[in-house]
Amino acid sequence: MAAESDVLHFQFEQQGDVVLQKMNLLRQQNLFCDVSIYINDTEFQGHKVILAACSTFMRDQFLLTQSKHVRITILQSAEVGWKLLLSCYTGALEVKRKELLKYLTAASYLQMVHIVEKCTEALSKYLEIDLSMKNNQHTDLCQSSDTDVKNEEENSDKDCEIIEISEDSPVNLDFHVKEEESNALQSAAETLTSERMRMQSPELSAVDGGFKENEICILHVESISTDDVENGQFSQPCTSSKAGIYFPETQHSLINSTVENRVTEVPGNTNQGLFSENSDGSHGTVNEIQNLDENFSLRHQCPRCPRGFLHVENYLRHLKMHKLFLCLQCGKTFTQKKNLNRHIRGHMGIRPFQCTVCLKTFTAKSTLQDHLNIHSGDRPYKCHCCDMDFKHKSALKKHLTSVHGRSSGEKLSRPDLKRQNLL
């Protein structure tokens, strides 16, 4: 017990910050630097242990190669990457609001998780502020429109006559309405009916299902294929023979949001054959409606369901339900995070996997493994239809398609196997 009381414990709370400051000072003096990072031809002198501790991407680079020179190509400016690496020493990062998405993309590529979290929080905060401002503007517009409606109702109440009905009153009551107003309303109704019958085509009459002017329906175009949507080309306009009114369960939330915003979103050129009925009974294209307020257009369309989103954070939250990963650079989605990381490396032009024999570089580890089969002579990919084997998986797929006429996922039945063996 006496020996334990002689032990003194010291805790240096500022040790980490002091060490980083001294390491940054050594970096500025180019002392003990063991690696040079080239970001779009901009050099950054640093220490591998510091960079590897802050960036998973840099750690993998240092494990794959022992070179003292690492080259990184990013689509953002070199200043963005340089500041990200500098933050490994300073523990601070200054980001302009308009460049927040650039830093988020570059930090995602360098796999600097702590910076990605901060940028995501800041981005969500600013987007919520913008959304609240737009909602306030929309509320003001709604209030002004409600005021106009109330004024119209008050004016209409002045022309109405209140009739009290008692028990002694006869069953058939004659309501005394001004004759001139009755004639005017009747003539206006006849004119509106004839105008609608003249403007409405036979094709659109088949689509009309008795809905009121303010009701919302969704037109489902069955003739449009996925390839046509991606290419933005459509063979013909939407007609009644190709369109049907339906309300699937997957679109309930979309219908609710459409009712709240009173906005219809039609992607690409599909709106060339769609028509909407105005309040006066005339027909106009959807383009004319969308031109009234382009700020409410849905910029992000979910690839798995018909949902569309205006803001990035809502779109990202929705993709988590489908277990999808989004590339912030081009908007492409992936089912696995490793495929997203490989895709981002393709954007940046980075080939982190290098062959130790010929020093050739690759974007994916699987491609490097196939390449190593050339040096080792291994042929691990075997055809289940015959006895041939291949070094590369792509060669096996090509063999199955050209020789056996089937994909790699298909398997032969027993009669087919016997026939192949006889051949």
UniProtKB/Swiss-Prot annotation:
Gene3D superfamilies: Classic Zinc Finger, Potassium Channel Kv1.1, Chain A
Compartment(s) of residence: Nucleus
Function: May be involved in transcriptional regulation.
Keyword set includes Glycoprotein: no
Entries under InterPro entries matching the protein: BTB/POZ_dom (IPR000210), SKP1/BTB/POZ_sf (IPR011333), Znf_C2H2_sf (IPR036236), Znf_C2H2_type (IPR013087), ZnFinger_BTB_dom_contain (IPR050457)
Phosphoserine modifications at: S201
Zinc finger (C2H2-type): 300-322, 325-347, 353-375, 381-404
Residue ranges constituting the BTB domain according to the UniProt record: 33-97
GO CC annotations, alphabetized: mitochondrion; nucleoplasm
PROSITE patterns: BTB, ZINC_FINGER_C2H2_1, ZINC_FINGER_C2H2_2
Major localisation: nucleus
GO molecular function: DNA binding; zinc ion binding
Keywords: DNA-binding, Metal-binding, Nucleus, Phosphoprotein, Repeat, Transcription, Transcription regulation, Zinc, Zinc-finger
Organism the protein comes from: Mus musculus (Mouse)
Protein's recorded name: Zinc finger and BTB domain-containing protein 6
Gene responsible for this protein: Zbtb6
Highest taxon of the lineage: Eukaryota
